[in-house]
Regions:
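Class I SAM-dependent methyltransferase SAM/SAH-binding core
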Residues: 50, 58-107
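A short glycine-rich, Lys/Arg-flanked "PGG" loop and its adjoining helix->strand segment in the class I
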Residues: 135-147
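Conserved glycine-rich SAM-binding loop
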Residues: 55
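Conserved class I S-adenosyl-L-methionine
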Residues: 1-45, 58-62, 106, 152-181, 186-190
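Short alpha-helix
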Residues: 223-238
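Core SAM-dependent methyltransferase catalytic element
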Residues: 241-266
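A conserved beta-strand element that flanks and buttresses the S-adenosyl-L-methionine
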Residues: 121
Length: 266
């Protein structure tokens, strides 16, 4: 497999970010709010942060730009994203990118954490997990976060169409209308078009083939776990004491969950 160089990787990541920003016009604002919450919520300059479903490292490097002393362990099961991140950010102090699948029990052991993590973060990734895998992942995550540890997840979280059919319909309609106003001629590059282009690049085609072999997105239809209520219920079941929305634009939300703090010794 030809070696992926840093400049090519950065070009592909820039193209990825551009494609994502068209689908998520408030992506940078959400990144900023998430990092604000990490900084404020952990209360230390060097929080140990887990980036779940890190992709090529878009969030991780923004975290390190703000908090250069924070060790960030990114994890993903996608070999293409990991190859891009490793080629682009090799040698970046504080950053580790780990190849693992959060659907597999015991996934957290592969992170080899030196201490309990202060925060776990994710953006536009955890909705890929089927509900039973999401619940198991949250339960395992709670075992590797320290007391008072945070989960911060930025994503499109939908309302329950059975419980709130009108609100759910309006929520979706507003997002679709905004998208049509911003891009009347359609997006310059769709998610699927980006992947088709990546598969045609000799420097990435081998990683794309490995992605297909692993069946990373087999059966994925984009709505496995998008309902807000599913995440809230799963997090409470996993032992998180507080769950709520910190930032929101339409159905684009930053969900925050907090583990109980240790009781003071008596």
């Amino acid at each position: 497999m030809p070696e992926l160089d840093r400049d090519t990787a950065l070009d592909w990541i820039e193209r990825w970010d551009r494609q994502q920003e068209e689908s998520l016009p408030d992506r940078e604002d959400r990144f900023t709010a998430l990092i604000d919450a990490v900084e404020e919520g952990t209360g230390r300059p060097d929080p140990l942060v887990l980036d779940l479903g890190c992709g090529p490292g878009s969030l991780a490097v923004r975290l390190l730009d703000r908090l250069p002393r924070a060790p960030v362990s990114g994890s993903d099961a996608d070999p293409v994203s990991l190859a891009l991140g490793r080629a682009a950010y090799s040698g970046r102090p504080g950053l580790r990118l780990v190849d693992l699948d959060m659907r597999e029990p015991g996934w957290s052991a592969r992170l080899n954490l030196a201490r309990p993590a202060d925060a776990a973060v994710s953006t536009t990734a955890l909705h890929w997990l089927p509900e039973h895998d999401l619940r198991a992942m949250y339960a395992e995550l709670a075992t590797v976060l320290g007391p008072g540890g945070l989960l911060l997840d930025g994503d499109h979280f939908t309302l329950d169409v059975k419980e709130s059919p009108t609100l759910a319909r309006l929520d979706l309609a507003l997002r679709q209308r905004e998208d049509q106003r911003r891009f009347p001629a359609g997006h310059s590059e769709s998610w699927s078009a980006w992947w088709e282009a990546a598969a045609a690049d000799p420097l990435l085609s081998g990683h794309v083939a490995e992605r297909a072999r692993r069946r990373v997105d087999a059966g994925h239809h984009g709505t496995e776990s998008t309902q807000l209520a599913t995440h809230v219920e799963a997090l409470i079941q996993a032992g998180f004491a507080e769950v709520g929305t910190l930032w929101q634009r339409g159905d684009n939300r930053l969900l925050c969950a907090v583990l109980p703090a240790e009781y003071p010794s008596r």
